[in-house]
UniProtKB/Swiss-Prot annotation:
GO terms for molecular function: Glc3Man9GlcNAc2 oligosaccharide glucosidase activity; glucosylglycerate hydrolase activity; mannosylglycerate hydrolase activity. Keywords: Glycosidase, Hydrolase. InterPro entries: 6-hairpin_glycosidase_sf, 6hp_glycosidase-like_sf, Glycoside_hydrolase_63, MGH1-like_GH. This is Mannosylglycerate hydrolase MGH1. Optimum pH is 6.0-6.50. Activity is not dependent on divalent cations, but it is enhanced by Mn(2+). PANTHER family: MANNOSYL-OLIGOSACCHARIDE GLUCOSIDASE.
Length: 488
């Protein structure tokens, strides 16, 4: 298909917001656009009932054609975003290695080349600090397209050229899956044994630095640590952070993506206020915990950590790398009890908490479904969560929105305030199947398929129109297609 280089479908909704196209090769652009040119007429020909609720959507000829084209596009996207041992999320917008992005991307890379998938994880863990923390960004190469860079973070030699905060610890989850599905068992076992001590040290850091009181749930001290940066869950807690007299700055993200899809200035001012305060404390873990004006119990971080602990325990047995499993079992036992304190009976959903007030944070977000992924919900609570999810899906054209669509803070295109993210859909789908809600999981998978088919390979998607938004030719979306959506 002729046309400009893009990852957008050739026809978009009238409500779409134009933004700068991603910098991609002509080859990738043509593959993506060919994929979309086949998909859109096929989607139009199908009934809405067939599109969204067919229980065997992976069995038809349309899916077979779409699968071949999508997999080719996704492989090429990951190849183009490969910087030689690590993968960037998207060119320009995110030019470095992000923590949970790389862990999730490794799942897609494993469908292409196992050795490269292990290299992704190994490169990430090589940035681990002396205290066990794994930073949320590793600045491997200089770049002028992102702010704040390494000169702002000023991280000490632990090593240098990283940020001073972390992200949800997906890595152990990825290591287990790579080992379980490995074709090269010798390589996989050797790499799992190499990475196990680093994973264990990271998890120990979480409980030492972020749960010094032994509650069973860890704290996050910056919205960027949650991975869900501008979630409405943080509005109330973040608003109490006084904006310091921070140096003037220029946001680079707005040169790549429309401002209506990104966090607002008042949020960025507070993000940077926290950053400069943490730097002034020399990233001392005790001072950060007790002196930060923002400290929350984030469901995403805690659910992923719990699932990662479950997988770390499995890895201990599979690799023989840990002879005493009692420490890990203690973490999971305490968390299993503590998660009950995050369930909101009236909402039928789990909620994040403000650790400085002890109160629930008011916004209902997609993180509230992740206790199913972690396996910490009772049957009764899981049933309530499934009912709530069904209502959310009924309220939008495509799920899962990152915020309750009935919430006044819902914004369909603004980052984590409404858009659909395939990584969340994958985790929730896995959780639903874990609890026996296969039909609801199939519905989430079907919506995810429709989004990719009609919207391209984007960072996230509008839940009302299906339009791709944020960064284009996005690595973890491509990885989810390879490792989940089109993996049959």
């Amino acid at each position: 298909m002729a046309g400009p280089v893009r990852c957008l479908p050739p026809v978009v909704e009238a409500t779409s917001i134009p933004h700068a196209p991603p910098v991609i090769s002509k080859e990738v652009s043509e593959i993506v656009n060919n994929m979309l040119s086949v998909a859109i007429p096929a989607a139009a020909a199908a009934s809405a009932q067939d599109q969204r609720f067919a229980s065997q959507f992976r069995c038809g000829p349309e899916f077979t054609t779409m699968k071949a084209q999508a997999l080719e596009a996704c492989r090429k996207i990951l190849a183009e975003n490969d910087q030689g041992g690590y993968t960037i999320p998207a060119k320009g917008l995110y030019p470095y290695q992000w923590n949970w992005d790389s862990a999730l991307v490794s799942l897609g890379l494993a469908e292409m080349e196992e050795e490269r998938a292990w290299e992704e994880l190994d490169r990430l863990m090589s940035a681990q600090w002396e205290d066990g923390m794994v930073p949320h960004i590793v600045f491997h190469k200089p770049s002028s397209t992102y702010f704040p860079g390494p000169e702002i973070w000023g991280s000490p030699d632990k090593p240098r050229n990283t940020t001073g905060i972390t992200q949800p610890p997906v890595a152990a989850i990825s290591v287990r899956r790579l080992l379980e599905e490995a074709k090269d068992k010798a390589l996989a076992l050797a790499m799992a044994r190499k990475l196990f001590p680093k994973l264990l040290a990271w998890h120990r850091w979480f409980y030492r630095a972020r749960d010094p009181e032994g509650t069973g749930l860890v704290a996050t001290i910056h919205p960027w640590e949650t991975g869900m940066d501008n979630s409405p869950a943080w509005d109330e807690a973040l608003a109490r952070v006084p904006i310091d007299d921070i140096p003037p700055y220029v946001r680079r993200d707005l040169g790549h993506v429309d401002a209506k899809m990104r966090p607002q200035k008042a949020e960025y001012d507070r993000y940077l206020t926290l950053l400069y305060r943490f730097r002034a404390l020399d990233y001392d873990e005790a001072k950060l915990y007790y002196e930060t004006p923002f400290r929350v119990t984030d469901l995403c971080t805690n659910c992923i950590l719990h699932k990662a602990n479950e997988d770390l325990l499995w890895l201990a047995g599979a690799t023989g790398a840990c002879t005493d499993e009692s420490e890990i079992r203690g973490w999971t036992a305490r968390a299993n009890v503590a998660f009950d304190t995050l369930f909101d009976v009236e909402a039928g959903l789990y909620r994040c908490k403000d650790q400085l007030t002890g109160q629930f944070l008011p916004a209902a977000t997609s993180a509230g479904f992740l206790p199913l992924f972690a396996g910490v919900a009772s049957g009764e609570k899981a049933s309530a969560v499934a009912r709530t999810l069904g209502r959310w899906l009924d309220d939008v054209a495509y799920g899962i929105p990152s915020c309750d669509p009935r919430d006044p803070q819902f914004e369909a295109l603004r980052y984590w305030r409404g858009p659909v993210w395939l990584i969340v859909n994958w985790m929730v789908s896995e959780g639903l199947k874990r609890y026996g809600y296969g039909e609801l999981a199939q519905r989430v998978e079907r919506d995810s398929y429709e989004l990719v088919k009609n919207g391209g390979i984007f960072e996230y998607y509008c839940p009302l129109t299906g339009m791709g938004a944020g960064g284009g030719c996005f690595s973890w979306t491509a990885a989810m297609c390879l490792a989940w959506l089109f993996k049959t």
